[in-house]
Amino acid sequence: MLFARRLEQLKDLNRIRNFSIIAHIDHGKSTLADRFIQICGGLTEREMSSQVLDSMDIERERGITIKAQCVSLNYTATDGKTYLLNFIDTPGHVDFSYEVSRSLAACEGAILVVDAAQGVEAQTLAVCYTAIDQSLTVLPVLNKIDLPQAEPERVISEIEDIIGLDAQDAIRVSAKSGLGVNDVLEALVANIPPPKGDVHAPLQALIIDSWFDSYLGVVSLVRIVNGSIRKGDKMRVMSTGRAYEVDQVGIFTPKRTKLDALYAGEVGYVVAGIKEIQGAPVGDTLTLDRNPADKVLPGFQRVKPQVYAGLFPVSSDDFEAFREALAKLSLNDASLFYEPESSEALGFGFRCGFLGMLHMEIIQERLEREYNLDLISTAPTVVYQIVTQKGETLLIDNPSHLPPTPQIKEMYEPIVRANILVPQDYLGPIITLCVERRGVQVSMTYSGRHVSVVYDIPMSEVVSDFFDRLKSVSRGYASLDYNFQRFQIADLVKMDILINSERVDALAVIVHRDSAHSRGKLIAEKMQQLIPRQMFDVAIQAAIGSHIIARQTVKALRKNVTAKCYGGDVTRKRKLLEKQKAGKKRMKQVGHVEIPQEAFMAVFQTDKKK
Protein backbone atom coordinates (compact mmCIF):
# COMPACT_ATOMS: atom_id res chain seq x y z
CA MET A 1 0.00 0.00 0.00
CA LEU A 2 1.05 3.59 -0.66
CA PHE A 3 1.50 4.46 3.00
CA ALA A 4 2.86 1.34 4.63
CA ARG A 5 3.62 3.09 7.90
CA ARG A 6 0.60 5.39 7.79
CA LEU A 7 -1.38 3.93 10.69
CA GLU A 8 1.69 3.92 12.87
CA GLN A 9 2.14 7.64 12.11
CA LEU A 10 -1.49 8.46 12.74
CA LYS A 11 -1.53 6.82 16.17
CA ASP A 12 1.36 9.13 16.96
CA LEU A 13 0.39 12.68 15.95
CA ASN A 14 4.02 13.68 16.54
CA ARG A 15 4.79 12.12 13.16
CA ILE A 16 2.55 14.55 11.21
CA ARG A 17 3.52 18.03 9.98
CA ASN A 18 1.01 20.41 8.36
CA PHE A 19 2.52 23.48 6.71
CA SER A 20 2.02 26.07 3.95
CA ILE A 21 4.49 27.65 1.57
CA ILE A 22 4.03 31.44 1.49
CA ALA A 23 5.83 34.01 -0.65
CA HIS A 24 5.52 36.92 -3.06
CA ILE A 25 4.81 36.24 -6.77
CA ASP A 26 7.79 34.71 -8.59
CA HIS A 27 9.88 33.91 -5.52
CA GLY A 28 9.79 30.17 -6.24
CA LYS A 29 6.98 28.61 -4.16
CA SER A 30 5.74 26.24 -6.85
CA THR A 31 9.28 25.19 -7.83
CA LEU A 32 10.12 24.40 -4.18
CA ALA A 33 6.88 22.37 -3.98
CA ASP A 34 8.01 20.42 -7.09
CA ARG A 35 11.32 19.55 -5.36
CA PHE A 36 9.50 18.32 -2.22
CA ILE A 37 7.34 16.01 -4.35
CA GLN A 38 10.44 14.71 -6.17
CA ILE A 39 12.47 14.05 -3.01
CA CYS A 40 9.58 12.36 -1.20
CA GLY A 41 8.69 10.24 -4.24
CA GLY A 42 5.19 11.64 -4.73
CA LEU A 43 5.58 11.34 -8.49
CA THR A 44 8.07 9.45 -10.67
CA GLU A 45 10.55 11.38 -12.84
CA ARG A 46 8.37 10.61 -15.89
CA GLU A 47 5.24 12.06 -14.26
CA MET A 48 6.97 15.22 -13.03
CA SER A 49 6.46 18.50 -14.85
CA SER A 50 7.38 22.01 -13.77
CA GLN A 51 4.72 23.74 -11.63
CA VAL A 52 3.12 20.33 -11.09
CA LEU A 53 0.61 21.80 -8.58
CA ASP A 54 -0.50 24.61 -10.90
CA SER A 55 -3.10 22.44 -12.58
CA MET A 56 -5.05 25.12 -14.47
CA ASP A 57 -3.86 26.20 -17.93
CA ILE A 58 -4.17 29.84 -16.86
CA GLU A 59 -1.82 29.21 -13.91
CA ARG A 60 0.86 27.72 -16.15
CA GLU A 61 0.52 30.38 -18.86
CA ARG A 62 0.73 33.32 -16.46
CA GLY A 63 3.24 31.58 -14.18
CA ILE A 64 1.13 32.33 -11.09
CA THR A 65 -0.68 30.19 -8.52
CA ILE A 66 -4.41 30.94 -8.25
CA LYS A 67 -5.79 27.99 -6.26
CA ALA A 68 -4.10 26.60 -3.16
CA GLN A 69 -3.23 22.91 -3.69
CA CYS A 70 -2.73 20.30 -0.98
CA VAL A 71 -0.28 17.37 -1.11
CA SER A 72 0.48 14.57 1.39
CA LEU A 73 3.98 13.04 1.27
CA ASN A 74 6.03 10.50 3.23
CA TYR A 75 9.46 11.70 4.31
CA THR A 76 12.08 9.60 6.10
CA ALA A 77 14.14 11.97 8.24
CA THR A 78 17.74 11.50 9.39
CA ASP A 79 16.43 10.26 12.78
CA GLY A 80 15.16 7.15 10.92
CA LYS A 81 11.46 7.93 11.50
CA THR A 82 8.99 8.40 8.65
CA TYR A 83 6.89 11.55 8.84
CA LEU A 84 3.67 12.42 7.03
CA LEU A 85 3.99 15.90 5.49
CA ASN A 86 0.78 17.66 4.45
CA PHE A 87 1.64 20.84 2.63
CA ILE A 88 -0.35 23.51 0.84
CA ASP A 89 1.09 25.59 -2.02
CA THR A 90 -0.56 29.03 -1.78
CA PRO A 91 -0.97 31.95 -4.22
CA GLY A 92 1.28 35.01 -3.93
CA HIS A 93 -0.82 37.74 -5.54
CA VAL A 94 -2.61 40.27 -3.30
CA ASP A 95 -5.98 39.46 -4.97
CA PHE A 96 -5.81 35.89 -3.66
CA SER A 97 -4.88 36.67 -0.05
CA TYR A 98 -8.19 35.10 1.08
CA GLU A 99 -7.04 31.80 -0.46
CA VAL A 100 -3.83 32.08 1.61
CA SER A 101 -5.59 32.79 4.94
CA ARG A 102 -7.81 29.70 4.41
CA SER A 103 -4.76 27.54 3.76
CA LEU A 104 -3.00 28.83 6.88
CA ALA A 105 -6.02 27.88 9.03
CA ALA A 106 -5.26 24.21 8.26
CA CYS A 107 -1.58 24.40 9.26
CA GLU A 108 0.70 24.62 12.29
CA GLY A 109 3.59 26.16 10.40
CA ALA A 110 4.62 28.01 7.26
CA ILE A 111 7.74 28.23 5.10
CA LEU A 112 8.43 31.85 4.15
CA VAL A 113 10.24 31.78 0.79
CA VAL A 114 12.16 34.97 -0.05
CA ASP A 115 14.08 35.57 -3.28
CA ALA A 116 17.76 36.10 -2.31
CA ALA A 117 18.15 38.65 -5.11
CA GLN A 118 14.92 40.65 -4.80
CA GLY A 119 14.46 40.55 -1.04
CA VAL A 120 11.33 41.17 1.02
CA GLU A 121 8.29 42.51 -0.88
CA ALA A 122 5.00 44.03 0.30
CA GLN A 123 2.86 40.93 -0.21
CA THR A 124 5.44 38.75 1.57
CA LEU A 125 4.93 41.08 4.50
CA ALA A 126 1.12 40.89 4.43
CA VAL A 127 1.00 37.08 4.20
CA CYS A 128 3.68 36.66 6.84
CA TYR A 129 1.75 38.84 9.31
CA THR A 130 -1.37 36.72 8.64
CA ALA A 131 0.65 33.60 9.53
CA ILE A 132 2.05 35.22 12.70
CA ASP A 133 -1.48 36.38 13.72
CA GLN A 134 -2.64 32.76 13.46
CA SER A 135 0.24 31.73 15.78
CA LEU A 136 2.03 29.65 13.14
CA THR A 137 5.72 28.80 13.31
CA VAL A 138 7.38 30.59 10.38
CA LEU A 139 10.58 29.18 8.83
CA PRO A 140 12.49 31.68 6.63
CA VAL A 141 14.05 30.18 3.47
CA LEU A 142 16.25 32.10 1.00
CA ASN A 143 15.64 30.86 -2.54
CA LYS A 144 17.59 31.43 -5.81
CA ILE A 145 20.84 31.42 -3.83
CA ASP A 146 22.77 30.32 -6.96
CA LEU A 147 21.95 33.53 -8.88
CA PRO A 148 24.97 35.82 -9.43
CA GLN A 149 22.95 38.80 -8.07
CA ALA A 150 21.90 36.97 -4.87
CA GLU A 151 22.70 38.94 -1.69
CA PRO A 152 21.78 36.62 1.21
CA GLU A 153 23.26 38.81 3.97
CA ARG A 154 21.27 41.88 2.86
CA VAL A 155 18.05 39.84 2.54
CA ILE A 156 18.54 38.28 6.01
CA SER A 157 18.85 41.76 7.55
CA GLU A 158 15.74 42.86 5.57
CA ILE A 159 13.72 39.92 6.96
CA GLU A 160 14.83 40.86 10.48
CA ASP A 161 14.29 44.64 10.08
CA ILE A 162 11.07 44.69 8.05
CA ILE A 163 9.24 41.55 9.24
CA GLY A 164 10.86 41.10 12.64
CA LEU A 165 11.70 37.39 12.29
CA ASP A 166 15.01 35.93 13.46
CA ALA A 167 16.56 34.93 10.12
CA GLN A 168 20.17 34.21 11.08
CA ASP A 169 19.52 30.49 10.60
CA ALA A 170 17.52 30.99 7.36
CA ILE A 171 18.07 28.00 5.08
CA ARG A 172 19.73 28.84 1.77
CA VAL A 173 18.34 26.90 -1.18
CA SER A 174 18.06 26.82 -4.93
CA ALA A 175 14.66 25.25 -5.64
CA LYS A 176 15.55 25.05 -9.34
CA SER A 177 18.65 22.88 -8.87
CA GLY A 178 17.50 21.21 -5.62
CA LEU A 179 20.40 22.61 -3.55
CA GLY A 180 19.55 22.72 0.18
CA VAL A 181 15.98 21.38 -0.20
CA ASN A 182 16.72 18.40 2.09
CA ASP A 183 17.79 20.86 4.80
CA VAL A 184 14.35 22.53 4.53
CA LEU A 185 12.60 19.17 5.05
CA GLU A 186 14.79 18.42 8.09
CA ALA A 187 14.09 21.89 9.55
CA LEU A 188 10.35 21.33 9.01
CA VAL A 189 10.37 18.11 10.98
CA ALA A 190 12.50 19.66 13.74
CA ASN A 191 10.78 23.06 14.13
CA ILE A 192 7.13 22.90 13.06
CA PRO A 193 4.92 21.56 15.88
CA PRO A 194 2.78 18.45 15.26
CA PRO A 195 -1.02 18.89 15.14
CA LYS A 196 -3.13 18.64 18.29
CA GLY A 197 -6.21 16.45 18.16
CA ASP A 198 -7.92 13.35 19.51
CA VAL A 199 -8.65 10.44 17.14
CA HIS A 200 -11.29 9.07 19.59
CA ALA A 201 -13.24 12.35 20.00
CA PRO A 202 -16.38 13.11 17.91
CA LEU A 203 -15.49 14.10 14.34
CA GLN A 204 -14.74 17.77 13.63
CA ALA A 205 -13.46 18.47 10.12
CA LEU A 206 -12.92 21.97 8.70
CA ILE A 207 -13.75 22.43 4.99
CA ILE A 208 -10.79 24.33 3.53
CA ASP A 209 -11.92 24.22 -0.10
CA SER A 210 -14.62 22.68 -2.29
CA TRP A 211 -15.01 22.14 -6.01
CA PHE A 212 -17.58 20.54 -8.26
CA ASP A 213 -16.77 17.35 -10.16
CA SER A 214 -19.17 16.33 -12.95
CA TYR A 215 -19.03 12.65 -11.87
CA LEU A 216 -18.52 12.77 -8.09
CA GLY A 217 -20.52 15.90 -7.17
CA VAL A 218 -18.98 18.20 -4.55
CA VAL A 219 -15.41 17.25 -3.53
CA SER A 220 -14.36 18.87 -0.22
CA LEU A 221 -10.79 19.37 0.95
CA VAL A 222 -10.85 18.99 4.75
CA ARG A 223 -8.55 19.23 7.75
CA ILE A 224 -9.53 16.61 10.35
CA VAL A 225 -9.21 18.37 13.72
CA ASN A 226 -10.67 15.61 15.93
CA GLY A 227 -12.02 12.10 15.33
CA SER A 228 -11.92 10.15 12.08
CA ILE A 229 -14.05 9.68 8.97
CA ARG A 230 -14.27 6.58 6.78
CA LYS A 231 -16.10 5.38 3.70
CA GLY A 232 -19.71 4.41 4.53
CA ASP A 233 -20.01 6.85 7.49
CA LYS A 234 -22.99 9.18 7.59
CA MET A 235 -21.61 12.70 7.88
CA ARG A 236 -23.48 15.89 8.72
CA VAL A 237 -22.78 19.42 7.43
CA MET A 238 -23.18 21.45 10.64
CA SER A 239 -24.45 24.73 9.09
CA THR A 240 -27.28 23.08 7.13
CA GLY A 241 -27.87 20.01 9.36
CA ARG A 242 -28.11 17.82 6.25
CA ALA A 243 -26.61 14.32 6.34
CA TYR A 244 -24.85 12.47 3.50
CA GLU A 245 -23.24 9.05 3.16
CA VAL A 246 -19.49 9.20 2.56
CA ASP A 247 -18.63 7.56 -0.79
CA GLN A 248 -14.91 8.13 -0.81
CA VAL A 249 -12.09 9.58 1.32
CA GLY A 250 -8.45 10.02 0.42
CA ILE A 251 -5.44 12.27 0.02
CA PHE A 252 -3.49 13.92 -2.79
CA THR A 253 0.03 12.62 -3.41
CA PRO A 254 -0.44 14.86 -5.63
CA LYS A 255 -2.55 12.31 -7.54
CA ARG A 256 -5.95 11.66 -5.94
CA THR A 257 -5.45 8.50 -3.85
CA LYS A 258 -8.34 6.65 -2.15
CA LEU A 259 -7.93 5.53 1.49
CA ASP A 260 -10.08 3.63 3.98
CA ALA A 261 -10.22 6.51 6.48
CA LEU A 262 -8.87 9.94 7.44
CA TYR A 263 -7.75 10.56 11.03
CA ALA A 264 -7.18 13.59 13.32
CA GLY A 265 -4.31 15.77 12.12
CA GLU A 266 -4.67 14.81 8.46
CA VAL A 267 -5.60 16.91 5.43
CA GLY A 268 -7.50 15.03 2.72
CA TYR A 269 -10.61 15.00 0.56
CA VAL A 270 -14.14 13.73 1.20
CA VAL A 271 -16.76 12.83 -1.46
CA ALA A 272 -20.33 12.26 -0.28
CA GLY A 273 -22.39 12.50 -3.46
CA ILE A 274 -23.51 16.07 -2.68
CA LYS A 275 -25.12 17.28 -5.88
CA GLU A 276 -26.38 20.71 -4.83
CA ILE A 277 -23.63 23.22 -5.38
CA GLN A 278 -23.87 24.99 -2.00
CA GLY A 279 -24.12 21.68 -0.10
CA ALA A 280 -20.72 21.95 1.63
CA PRO A 281 -19.70 25.62 1.97
CA VAL A 282 -16.06 26.53 2.59
CA GLY A 283 -15.33 27.25 6.27
CA ASP A 284 -18.08 24.88 7.45
CA THR A 285 -17.62 21.98 9.88
CA LEU A 286 -18.34 18.31 9.12
CA THR A 287 -19.26 15.86 11.88
CA LEU A 288 -20.73 12.35 12.12
CA ASP A 289 -24.50 11.91 12.25
CA ARG A 290 -24.40 9.14 14.89
CA ASN A 291 -21.97 10.92 17.24
CA PRO A 292 -22.04 14.65 16.44
CA ALA A 293 -19.63 17.24 17.84
CA ASP A 294 -21.06 19.92 20.17
CA LYS A 295 -19.22 22.90 18.71
CA VAL A 296 -18.67 24.26 15.23
CA LEU A 297 -15.02 25.02 14.41
CA PRO A 298 -14.18 28.70 13.96
CA GLY A 299 -14.44 29.17 10.19
CA PHE A 300 -13.07 31.97 8.06
CA GLN A 301 -13.99 35.60 8.02
CA ARG A 302 -16.12 36.22 4.93
CA VAL A 303 -14.20 38.43 2.55
CA LYS A 304 -15.96 41.41 0.97
CA PRO A 305 -15.56 42.01 -2.78
CA GLN A 306 -13.66 45.20 -3.61
CA VAL A 307 -14.46 45.54 -7.32
CA TYR A 308 -17.79 45.04 -9.09
CA ALA A 309 -18.47 44.57 -12.80
CA GLY A 310 -21.34 43.36 -14.95
CA LEU A 311 -20.77 40.14 -16.91
CA PHE A 312 -23.16 39.44 -19.79
CA PRO A 313 -23.31 36.51 -22.24
CA VAL A 314 -22.92 37.67 -25.86
CA SER A 315 -25.77 35.33 -26.83
CA SER A 316 -28.87 35.53 -24.61
CA ASP A 317 -29.34 31.75 -25.17
CA ASP A 318 -26.27 31.16 -22.96
CA PHE A 319 -27.82 32.83 -19.88
CA GLU A 320 -28.79 29.58 -18.08
CA ALA A 321 -25.42 27.96 -18.85
CA PHE A 322 -23.76 31.13 -17.51
CA ARG A 323 -25.81 30.98 -14.28
CA GLU A 324 -24.79 27.33 -13.74
CA ALA A 325 -21.13 28.06 -14.52
CA LEU A 326 -21.07 30.91 -11.96
CA ALA A 327 -22.64 28.67 -9.31
CA LYS A 328 -19.98 25.97 -9.86
CA LEU A 329 -17.17 28.51 -9.88
CA SER A 330 -18.39 30.25 -6.71
CA LEU A 331 -18.22 26.91 -4.87
CA ASN A 332 -14.55 26.68 -5.79
CA ASP A 333 -13.91 30.40 -5.22
CA ALA A 334 -15.79 31.51 -2.11
CA SER A 335 -14.74 35.15 -2.58
CA LEU A 336 -16.78 35.49 -5.79
CA PHE A 337 -20.11 37.29 -5.34
CA TYR A 338 -22.83 37.50 -8.01
CA GLU A 339 -26.46 38.59 -8.44
CA PRO A 340 -28.69 38.87 -11.55
CA GLU A 341 -28.66 42.18 -13.41
CA SER A 342 -30.27 43.49 -16.58
CA SER A 343 -28.97 46.21 -18.88
CA GLU A 344 -30.80 48.00 -21.69
CA ALA A 345 -27.70 47.73 -23.85
CA LEU A 346 -26.53 44.20 -23.00
CA GLY A 347 -29.65 42.30 -21.89
CA PHE A 348 -29.58 39.85 -18.95
CA GLY A 349 -26.40 39.01 -17.05
CA PHE A 350 -24.89 39.12 -13.55
CA ARG A 351 -23.32 41.78 -11.37
CA CYS A 352 -20.19 40.10 -9.99
CA GLY A 353 -17.96 41.12 -7.08
CA PHE A 354 -14.21 40.43 -7.17
CA LEU A 355 -11.23 40.94 -4.86
CA GLY A 356 -9.28 42.92 -7.45
CA MET A 357 -8.57 43.38 -11.14
CA LEU A 358 -6.46 40.22 -11.56
CA HIS A 359 -9.19 38.20 -9.82
CA MET A 360 -11.74 39.64 -12.26
CA GLU A 361 -9.57 38.79 -15.31
CA ILE A 362 -8.98 35.25 -14.06
CA ILE A 363 -12.69 34.61 -13.35
CA GLN A 364 -13.72 35.87 -16.79
CA GLU A 365 -11.00 33.78 -18.45
CA ARG A 366 -11.98 30.65 -16.48
CA LEU A 367 -15.67 31.09 -17.38
CA GLU A 368 -14.78 31.44 -21.06
CA ARG A 369 -12.32 28.52 -21.13
CA GLU A 370 -13.79 25.98 -18.74
CA TYR A 371 -17.46 26.54 -19.60
CA ASN A 372 -17.15 27.65 -23.29
CA LEU A 373 -18.97 30.95 -22.73
CA ASP A 374 -18.58 34.14 -24.74
CA LEU A 375 -18.84 37.09 -22.30
CA ILE A 376 -18.82 40.87 -22.31
CA SER A 377 -17.75 42.65 -19.12
CA THR A 378 -18.59 46.23 -18.21
CA ALA A 379 -16.12 48.65 -16.67
CA PRO A 380 -15.26 47.69 -13.06
CA THR A 381 -16.42 49.95 -10.25
CA VAL A 382 -16.05 50.05 -6.46
CA VAL A 383 -18.76 50.42 -3.79
CA TYR A 384 -19.79 53.99 -2.98
CA GLN A 385 -21.75 55.12 0.06
CA ILE A 386 -24.58 57.58 -0.65
CA VAL A 387 -26.46 59.66 1.93
CA THR A 388 -29.80 60.87 0.50
CA GLN A 389 -31.66 64.09 1.39
CA LYS A 390 -34.01 61.92 3.52
CA GLY A 391 -31.04 60.74 5.59
CA GLU A 392 -30.95 57.17 4.20
CA THR A 393 -27.56 55.50 3.63
CA LEU A 394 -27.20 53.45 0.43
CA LEU A 395 -24.31 51.32 -0.85
CA ILE A 396 -24.06 51.56 -4.65
CA ASP A 397 -21.92 49.18 -6.72
CA ASN A 398 -23.44 50.07 -10.10
CA PRO A 399 -23.36 53.64 -11.51
CA SER A 400 -26.73 53.13 -13.24
CA HIS A 401 -28.36 52.59 -9.80
CA LEU A 402 -27.24 56.00 -8.54
CA PRO A 403 -30.22 58.15 -7.39
CA PRO A 404 -30.89 61.42 -9.32
CA THR A 405 -28.50 64.24 -8.31
CA PRO A 406 -31.15 66.37 -6.44
CA GLN A 407 -31.83 63.41 -4.08
CA ILE A 408 -28.14 63.01 -3.11
CA LYS A 409 -26.90 64.88 -0.04
CA GLU A 410 -23.38 63.40 0.27
CA MET A 411 -21.26 60.80 -1.54
CA TYR A 412 -18.48 58.81 0.12
CA GLU A 413 -15.78 56.82 -1.65
CA PRO A 414 -13.79 53.87 -0.22
CA ILE A 415 -10.20 54.63 0.80
CA VAL A 416 -7.52 51.92 0.94
CA ARG A 417 -4.27 51.98 2.87
CA ALA A 418 -1.57 51.06 0.36
CA ASN A 419 1.75 49.76 1.66
CA ILE A 420 4.40 50.13 -1.06
CA LEU A 421 7.92 48.69 -0.70
CA VAL A 422 10.33 50.26 -3.18
CA PRO A 423 14.12 50.65 -3.66
CA GLN A 424 15.24 54.21 -2.78
CA ASP A 425 16.21 54.97 -6.43
CA TYR A 426 12.55 54.79 -7.53
CA LEU A 427 10.98 56.69 -4.62
CA GLY A 428 10.40 59.92 -6.61
CA PRO A 429 8.27 58.42 -9.43
CA ILE A 430 6.26 56.38 -6.88
CA ILE A 431 5.38 59.49 -4.83
CA THR A 432 4.41 61.34 -8.06
CA LEU A 433 2.15 58.43 -9.06
CA CYS A 434 0.46 58.32 -5.63
CA VAL A 435 -0.15 62.10 -5.65
CA GLU A 436 -1.56 61.84 -9.21
CA ARG A 437 -4.01 59.26 -7.87
CA ARG A 438 -5.18 61.61 -5.08
CA GLY A 439 -3.13 59.76 -2.45
CA VAL A 440 -2.32 61.17 1.00
CA GLN A 441 0.97 60.09 2.58
CA VAL A 442 0.65 58.41 5.98
CA SER A 443 4.24 57.37 6.68
CA MET A 444 7.64 56.65 5.15
CA THR A 445 10.19 54.28 6.70
CA TYR A 446 13.73 53.63 5.47
CA SER A 447 15.27 50.18 6.03
CA GLY A 448 18.49 49.41 4.20
CA ARG A 449 18.07 50.05 0.49
CA HIS A 450 14.29 49.86 0.64
CA VAL A 451 11.69 52.43 1.61
CA SER A 452 8.28 51.46 2.97
CA VAL A 453 5.78 54.13 1.87
CA VAL A 454 2.22 54.09 3.21
CA TYR A 455 -0.48 56.07 1.39
CA ASP A 456 -4.24 56.43 1.77
CA ILE A 457 -5.57 56.27 -1.81
CA PRO A 458 -9.16 56.14 -3.15
CA MET A 459 -9.92 52.53 -4.07
CA SER A 460 -11.28 53.53 -7.49
CA GLU A 461 -7.79 54.82 -8.36
CA VAL A 462 -6.10 51.60 -7.18
CA VAL A 463 -8.33 49.00 -8.86
CA SER A 464 -7.90 50.31 -12.41
CA ASP A 465 -4.31 50.16 -13.67
CA PHE A 466 -2.45 51.38 -10.56
CA PHE A 467 -0.57 48.09 -10.09
CA ASP A 468 0.67 48.11 -13.72
CA ARG A 469 1.72 51.77 -13.51
CA LEU A 470 3.49 51.12 -10.19
CA LYS A 471 5.48 48.31 -11.80
CA SER A 472 6.30 50.40 -14.87
CA VAL A 473 7.57 53.52 -13.03
CA SER A 474 9.74 51.36 -10.73
CA ARG A 475 10.92 48.96 -13.48
CA GLY A 476 9.17 46.12 -11.70
CA TYR A 477 10.93 46.61 -8.34
CA ALA A 478 8.06 48.15 -6.33
CA SER A 479 5.53 45.87 -4.65
CA LEU A 480 2.10 46.70 -3.30
CA ASP A 481 -0.25 45.45 -0.62
CA TYR A 482 -3.48 47.25 0.26
CA ASN A 483 -6.56 46.86 2.45
CA PHE A 484 -9.80 48.79 2.91
CA GLN A 485 -9.55 51.55 5.50
CA ARG A 486 -12.72 53.69 5.54
CA PHE A 487 -15.31 55.65 3.55
CA GLN A 488 -14.45 59.32 2.99
CA ILE A 489 -16.61 62.18 1.68
CA ALA A 490 -15.75 63.20 -1.88
CA ASP A 491 -17.02 65.40 -4.71
CA LEU A 492 -18.15 62.63 -7.06
CA VAL A 493 -20.32 62.78 -10.18
CA LYS A 494 -21.88 60.23 -12.50
CA MET A 495 -20.57 60.50 -16.06
CA ASP A 496 -22.73 59.02 -18.82
CA ILE A 497 -21.50 58.01 -22.26
CA LEU A 498 -23.93 58.73 -25.11
CA ILE A 499 -23.68 56.98 -28.46
CA ASN A 500 -25.76 58.86 -31.08
CA SER A 501 -27.56 60.75 -28.27
CA GLU A 502 -28.55 57.51 -26.49
CA ARG A 503 -27.23 56.84 -22.99
CA VAL A 504 -25.51 53.44 -22.77
CA ASP A 505 -26.14 52.34 -19.16
CA ALA A 506 -23.28 49.81 -19.22
CA LEU A 507 -20.73 52.56 -19.97
CA ALA A 508 -21.66 54.94 -17.11
CA VAL A 509 -18.89 55.63 -14.56
CA ILE A 510 -18.62 57.48 -11.24
CA VAL A 511 -15.67 59.90 -11.28
CA HIS A 512 -14.22 62.71 -9.17
CA ARG A 513 -15.45 66.10 -10.42
CA ASP A 514 -11.88 67.45 -10.81
CA SER A 515 -10.91 64.69 -13.24
CA ALA A 516 -14.28 64.40 -15.04
CA HIS A 517 -13.36 66.62 -18.03
CA SER A 518 -10.01 64.98 -18.76
CA ARG A 519 -11.43 61.51 -18.15
CA GLY A 520 -14.46 62.19 -20.40
CA LYS A 521 -12.21 63.48 -23.19
CA LEU A 522 -9.93 60.43 -22.95
CA ILE A 523 -12.84 57.98 -22.99
CA ALA A 524 -14.44 59.70 -26.01
CA GLU A 525 -11.11 59.63 -27.91
CA LYS A 526 -10.53 55.98 -27.06
CA MET A 527 -14.09 55.02 -28.05
CA GLN A 528 -13.67 56.86 -31.36
CA GLN A 529 -10.71 54.58 -32.17
CA LEU A 530 -12.52 51.41 -31.08
CA ILE A 531 -16.03 51.77 -32.53
CA PRO A 532 -16.00 50.63 -36.20
CA ARG A 533 -17.08 53.13 -38.86
CA GLN A 534 -20.71 52.92 -39.98
CA MET A 535 -22.61 54.17 -43.03
CA PHE A 536 -23.52 57.25 -40.96
CA ASP A 537 -21.72 59.55 -38.51
CA VAL A 538 -21.59 58.19 -34.93
CA ALA A 539 -21.46 60.86 -32.20
CA ILE A 540 -19.74 59.84 -28.95
CA GLN A 541 -20.42 62.19 -26.03
CA ALA A 542 -19.48 62.24 -22.35
CA ALA A 543 -22.05 63.99 -20.17
CA ILE A 544 -22.61 64.94 -16.53
CA GLY A 545 -26.38 65.22 -16.19
CA SER A 546 -27.49 67.23 -19.25
CA HIS A 547 -24.11 68.99 -19.59
CA ILE A 548 -21.95 67.58 -22.43
CA ILE A 549 -18.27 67.72 -21.41
CA ALA A 550 -16.59 65.95 -24.36
CA ARG A 551 -17.45 64.85 -27.89
CA GLN A 552 -15.86 62.85 -30.71
CA THR A 553 -17.33 61.71 -34.03
CA VAL A 554 -16.70 58.46 -35.88
CA LYS A 555 -16.90 59.63 -39.50
CA ALA A 556 -19.20 57.78 -41.90
CA LEU A 557 -18.02 55.49 -44.67
CA ARG A 558 -18.93 57.27 -47.91
CA LYS A 559 -19.83 55.97 -51.32
CA ASN A 560 -19.03 58.24 -54.27
CA VAL A 561 -22.54 58.50 -55.74
CA THR A 562 -21.51 61.05 -58.39
CA ALA A 563 -18.91 58.77 -59.98
CA LYS A 564 -21.35 57.70 -62.72
CA CYS A 565 -22.01 61.35 -63.76
CA TYR A 566 -19.59 62.28 -66.50
CA GLY A 567 -19.94 65.95 -67.32
CA GLY A 568 -23.58 67.05 -67.49
CA ASP A 569 -25.45 69.53 -65.33
CA VAL A 570 -24.34 70.22 -61.72
CA THR A 571 -27.97 69.92 -60.53
CA ARG A 572 -27.83 66.20 -61.41
CA LYS A 573 -24.89 65.73 -59.03
CA ARG A 574 -26.56 67.84 -56.37
CA LYS A 575 -29.74 65.75 -56.61
CA LEU A 576 -27.76 62.51 -56.07
CA LEU A 577 -25.88 64.00 -53.08
CA GLU A 578 -29.14 65.27 -51.50
CA LYS A 579 -30.66 61.80 -51.94
CA GLN A 580 -27.62 60.21 -50.25
CA LYS A 581 -27.79 62.76 -47.41
CA ALA A 582 -31.50 61.99 -46.78
CA GLY A 583 -30.77 58.24 -46.80
CA LYS A 584 -27.96 58.66 -44.25
CA LYS A 585 -30.21 60.80 -42.04
CA ARG A 586 -32.90 58.09 -42.08
CA MET A 587 -30.27 55.39 -41.47
CA LYS A 588 -28.93 57.32 -38.48
CA GLN A 589 -32.40 57.31 -36.87
CA VAL A 590 -32.83 53.54 -37.16
CA GLY A 591 -29.16 52.47 -37.39
CA HIS A 592 -27.73 50.27 -34.64
CA VAL A 593 -24.11 50.73 -33.52
CA GLU A 594 -22.22 47.61 -32.42
CA ILE A 595 -19.98 48.40 -29.44
CA PRO A 596 -16.97 46.05 -29.19
CA GLN A 597 -15.79 44.56 -25.83
CA GLU A 598 -12.61 46.71 -25.89
CA ALA A 599 -14.77 49.85 -25.75
CA PHE A 600 -16.31 48.77 -22.42
CA MET A 601 -12.83 48.22 -20.97
CA ALA A 602 -11.62 51.60 -22.34
CA VAL A 603 -13.84 53.31 -19.77
CA PHE A 604 -11.50 52.29 -16.96
CA GLN A 605 -8.17 51.85 -18.76
CA THR A 606 -7.93 55.53 -19.71
CA ASP A 607 -7.57 56.48 -16.08
CA LYS A 608 -4.71 58.93 -16.41
CA LYS A 609 -2.13 59.74 -19.02
CA LYS A 610 0.14 56.79 -19.55
Curated annotation (Swiss-Prot):
**Magnesium listed as a keyword:** no
Species of provenance: Legionella pneumophila (strain Lens)
The UniProt record lists the keyword Disulfide bond: no
> Biological process GO terms, please?
positive regulation of translation
* Predominant location: membrane
Q: What is this protein called?
A: Elongation factor 4
Give the record's family classification: Belongs to the TRAFAC class translation factor GTPase superfamily. Classic translation factor GTPase family. LepA subfamily.
Q: What is its EC number?
A: 3.6.5.n1
SMART domains according to UniProt: EFG_C
Q: Name one GO molecular function term.
A: translation elongation factor activity
UniProt xrefs under Pfam families: EFG_C (PF00679), GTP_EFTU (PF00009), GTP_EFTU_D2 (PF03144), LepA_C (PF06421)
NCBIfam families, per the entry: lepA (TIGR01393), small_GTP (TIGR00231)
Job description of the protein: Required for accurate and efficient protein synthesis under certain stress conditions. May act as a fidelity factor of the translation reaction, by catalyzing a one-codon backward translocation of tRNAs on improperly translocated ribosomes. Back-translocation proceeds from a post-translocation (POST) complex to a pre-translocation (PRE) complex, thus giving elongation factor G a second chance to translocate the tRNAs correctly. Binds to ribosomes in a GTP-dependent manner.
- Report how it sits in the membrane: Peripheral membrane protein
tr-type G domain sequence ranges: 14-196
What UniProt keywords apply to this chain's record, in alphabetical order? Answer: Cell inner membrane, Cell membrane, GTP-binding, Hydrolase, Membrane, Nucleotide-binding, Protein biosynthesis
| Gene transcribed to yield this protein | lepA
| Chemical reaction(s) catalysed | GTP + H2O = GDP + phosphate + H(+)
Gene Ontology cellular-component terms listed: plasma membrane
Identify the residues that bind GTP: 26-31, 143-146
According to the record, the signal peptide region is none
